[in-house]
């Protein structure tokens, strides 16, 4: 599941309630805690509050984070900031090589810029990092553009498939009009479900300005 939790999850308990209700094995977070000196402890607390284990990310990854359920193994991680113009928000990417049901699976979480030109530079780096991962790979996050945008097309050209539809728009959470949060998959998998995490709409609106995107994936 990918989820932009809004400014470090500042709305508190509703964020945790959304994730616990969705029961993801892997959670990819945008806008996780980033306060200097405190981000690591707060990121771990966030993951634990969701019933998960912090894996990687946080401030060094431009506020992107990976957390996993107890049964998911971690092989390796990589986090980096993406260069931005002076005064622009922090951006970054976090990648993790995981082991799920004895199989290698890669995940990459990103939150792309509001600037269209910057987004293309950033997503190219995302694709480069994702190519280093083995097994099926999930690339997910807030792309800040709709599915007809150039970043989605670049990901699709790199082999990532969008299984979503306009039936699950993600922003703004209270009355979603746009599908700007993506979860794309490459590799030998079957996507059983994509989009709606099955969480009450009022809780989603209380938790964040974005709705999460959940995929149920079978390894084949």
Model-derived segments and their meaning:
Residues 1-48, 64, 204, 219-220:
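N-terminal, active-site-proximal structural segment of metallo-dependent hydrolase catalytic domains
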Residues 72-79, 85, 131-136, 145-220:
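Metal-dependent phosphoester-hydrolase catalytic domains
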Residues 1-7, 76-78, 95, 104-113:
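Active-site-proximal beta-strand elements of phosphoester/diester hydrolases
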Residues 95-100, 106, 120-143, 151-152:
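His/acidic metal-ligating clusters that form di-metal
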Residues 27-30, 56-57, 138-142, 162-165:
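Active-site neighborhood of phospho(di)ester-bond hydrolases with catalytic His/Asp-centered motifs
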Residues 8-10, 33-38, 115-117, 143-150, ...:
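Active-site environment of divalent metal-dependent phosphoester hydrolases
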Residues 31-104, 193-198:
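Structured beta-strand-rich core segments of catalytic domains in phosphoester-bond hydrolases
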Residues 5, 32, 110-112, 141-143, ...:
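Active-site metal-binding loops of divalent metal-dependent hydrolases
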């Amino acid at each position: 599941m990918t989820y932009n939790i809004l400014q470090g999850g500042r709305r508190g308990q509703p964020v945790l309630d959304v994730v616990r209700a969705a029961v993801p094995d892997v959670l990819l977070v945008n806008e996780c805690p980033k306060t200097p000196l405190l981000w690591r402890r707060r990121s771990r607390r966030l993951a634990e509050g969701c019933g998960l284990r912090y894996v990687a990310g946080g401030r060094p990854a431009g506020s992107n984070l990976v957390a996993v359920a107890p049964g998911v193994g971690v092989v390796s991680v990589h986090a980096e900031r993406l260069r931005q113009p002076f005064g622009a928000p922090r951006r970054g990417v976090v990648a993790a090589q995981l082991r799920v049901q004895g199989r290698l699976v890669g995940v990459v979480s990103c939150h792309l810029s509001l600037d269209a030109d910057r987004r293309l530079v950033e997503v190219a780096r995302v694709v480069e990092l994702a190519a280093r991962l083995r097994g099926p790979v999930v690339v997910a996050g807030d792309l800040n553009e709709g599915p007809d945008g150039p970043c989605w097309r670049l990901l699709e050209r790199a082999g990532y498939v969008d299984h979503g539809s306009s039936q699950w728009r993600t922003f703004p959470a209270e009355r979603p009009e746009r599908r700007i949060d993506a979860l794309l998959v490459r590799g030998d998998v079957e996507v059983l479900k994509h989009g709606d995490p099955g969480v009450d709409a009022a809780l989603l609106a209380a938790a964040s300005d974005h709705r999460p995107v959940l995929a149920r994936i079978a390894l084949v």
